[in-house]
């Protein structure tokens, strides 16, 4: 399946750049210490909230939007001060190879790595005690990720696909609804998880 270049630019690279633009002006405030009031019995103590990195985040991304769901959570992990191990889908080998080359070329290899491969490599990664796991994909593998993370009490972010039903009631303009549903189900061709189920 060949994704149109314009869609990749808009729906993947563009959204990653939007995320970075959102993070950049806020990063100093997010990283700053914030004073917190203390209970009067603890006076004259002073309290602070300090953001700290979790450590190493594992990002497991899908084949349908590999750039978006690899680099957007990577930008978030970096903004939080974390290292990243990225596992792109084996079903998008060319894109995964380009991402691996870019990260090896421009990022510190002590802090950022890409592991390519299939289910066997993913299983080996899930045996490791990561500090956070971000997974985008189906519910079946999501439950495997969750079970593996539970062994180490690793926090998990799951962005799971599924059915996207469409409800059209009697007040809807049927011509408009039909066009929108047809567009959503046939663009790219219907690969994103948020497209209506046809």
Describe each PLM feature range.
Residues 36-43, 114-117, 180-181:
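Short gly/ser/thr-rich secondary-structure transition/capping motifs
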Residues 59, 76-77, 124, 148, ...:
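Hydrophobic/aromatic ligand-binding patch that stacks against planar heteroaromatic rings
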Residues 1-48:
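N-terminal Rossmann-like NAD(P)+-binding subdomain of aldehyde/semialdehyde dehydrogenases
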Residues 38-106, 110, 153, 175:
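Conserved small-residue-rich beta-alpha loop and adjacent elements
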Residues 107, 140-198:
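ALDH superfamily catalytic-core signature
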Residues 46-48, 113-131:
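A structured beta-alpha segment of the ubiquitous adenosine-cofactor-binding alpha/beta core
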Residues 20, 81, 112, 133, ...:
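Residue-level signal for inorganic ion chemistry
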Residues 82, 87-89, 116, 136-137, ...:
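Short beta->alpha connector loops at strand-helix junctions that form conserved
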